[in-house]
Amino acid sequence: MDLVAGDARDVVLVLSVDDTGAFSDPDRFTAHLPLGGGLDPTWLDLFSEAVRSVTGQGEPVDFLDARTELDGTAETVERIVERVDTDWVEAVAAVPDDLHGALAGRWIELLEEELGLLPREEKPWIRDMAGRIVVFTRKAAGARDVIFAWGF
C-alpha cells in the first residue's frame, strides 16, 4: 500500500512493472509514503477524523470519500489505484506542527475505539506514521496527482 505524488501515468507504469523502488526517484515523483501491509485503508478514515478532531475543522473528509478510482488500470496493475482529492491532501498538510502529538494520540484513541486496545508496542509506529502522513502531504501539495495504490 502506497501514497505517491507525481504523474498518475508514471505511477501506473511503475506499478505495472512492479518496480516500486522507482517511487523514490525525486526526478519522477514528488513524494512517496509506503504504508505497508499492516495498515488497513479504513485506518486512514480514522486518521481523517483525528485531523478534524484536533484542528476543530470540518476537513478533511474521510479518506474513503477523498478517493476516485483511476479508469483503465485493472488490466495493467494488480492493485487498486485511486486518485486522492487535492482538498484532502491540503487539509492534512495544514495541520500545525504543534498538533502532531495530539493528532497521533487522537488517531490511536479512534483506532482503539474501533479495534479494541492496541498492544503498547504498536503505538510508536502509529505515532510515527501520523507524522509521516503529514510530511508526505506537505511534500505532495501542488503535485500533479496524488495516488493511493493498495491491494486486497
Predicted region positions:
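Acidic (Asp/Glu-rich) sequence patches and key acidic residues
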Residues: M1-V135, K139-A143, G151
